[in-house]
Amino acid sequence: MGNLCSLFTPPKPVKKRKPITKRQSSIGASSSGSGLNSNRWNNRVRSSSSRRDNKFEDALIQEHALAAAAVLFRQQNGGGGSLPFDRSASQRYQGSCSKKNQLPRSSSSRSRSSTDPLLQPHQFLNQGIKLDDLETNHFVLVHGGSFGAWCWYKTIALLEEDGFKVTAIDLAGCGINSININGIASLSQYVKPLTDILEKLPIGEKVILVGHDFGGACISYAMELFPSKISKAVFLAAAMLTNGQSTLDMFSLKAGQNDLMRKAQIFIYTNGNENPPTAIDLDKSLLKDLLFNQSPSKDVALASVSMRSIPFAPVLEKLSLSDANYGSVRRYYIETLEDNAIPVTLQENMINSSPPEKVYRLKGADHAPFFSKPQALHKLLLEIARISPA
């Protein structure tokens, strides 16, 4: 919920590519026949290489567009508040856990083009290891404020390609969930689509929860209720709170350091200006700079037509988190180093206040790493999935 930071201040009333041309080689009158043939050969090689590059980029753009279109099609024709993606399990990772008090950190810094390919076949799980031997091969993805299950379309595709089961949830009033956002009065009401799924899990079955942004507070709430059904919890540029703390409390700590957020915030007063706001929206013209400063333009366009308001009441609610329940679930934090919505300093503050088992860092990732760094994020999720039970 990049827009959680919008709560920092008191409420207010209501390229184009240039055509590729061949270099023209000037041949003097004294040039030999072999020199002319060599220049012509080099021009043909350059032209062929340029055509291949163009075809690759065109195919890449078409691949992303088709994936986004598929998500929108499911939104319009599917039912319910979540998008299940099941596949038979056939591989797993090996790994070991680290001690909680050591706060190990890991960085992702591979070289890449400006746009990540959507699918890379079995880059990380092709080691002849069975997914069935993992503690769980089921990821449950929980979006942040204003987002919906649609934002995970790249992550869903990559995880499913590697044989994982994936459930992407629309929280109440988000994505294709039809509840009126202005009528949501509590965190329990907002996260009900998530708690419903966990409640229905068979005895002994566990999942890996991934919460982005305000989704961090949502998975924390679920961890307190269903600790035995959660193998691991991943906080992705997310609100990771302590007992008795609200999301507003945490994000208000850095209230004076985000002018862009203050400019973007729009408070909604369904019950009149004399009452507290019912929801928060964002200025669409500022979305790219605030949330998607490293993301492809196609994904910014998808978000601009898909994002919805976030309910205000859940942001104010203080969490009750116990060591016996919430504290028993293994936690991991993924920092986004180019984040303009939840700056790294605030992410570090949350980490220091409630240290997780391990911290990962996504270089070059904005507040939407599922758009800006999908492959690097995928690699980290697989690494976390392979960590052996404690």
From Swiss-Prot:
Residues 1-52, 94-119 are annotated as: Disordered. Residues 137-241 form the AB hydrolase-1 domain. GO terms for molecular function: hydrolase activity. It is found in: Plastid, Chloroplast. Gene3D superfamilies: alpha/beta hydrolase. One of its GO terms (cellular component) is chloroplast. The keyword Hydrolase applies. Keywords: Chloroplast, Hydrolase, Plastid, Transit peptide. The keyword Cytoplasm does not apply. Belongs to the AB hydrolase superfamily. Methylesterase family. Putative methylesterase. This is Putative methylesterase 11, chloroplastic. It comes from Arabidopsis thaliana. The lineage of its organism: Eukaryota, Viridiplantae, Streptophyta, Embryophyta, Tracheophyta. The gene is MES11.
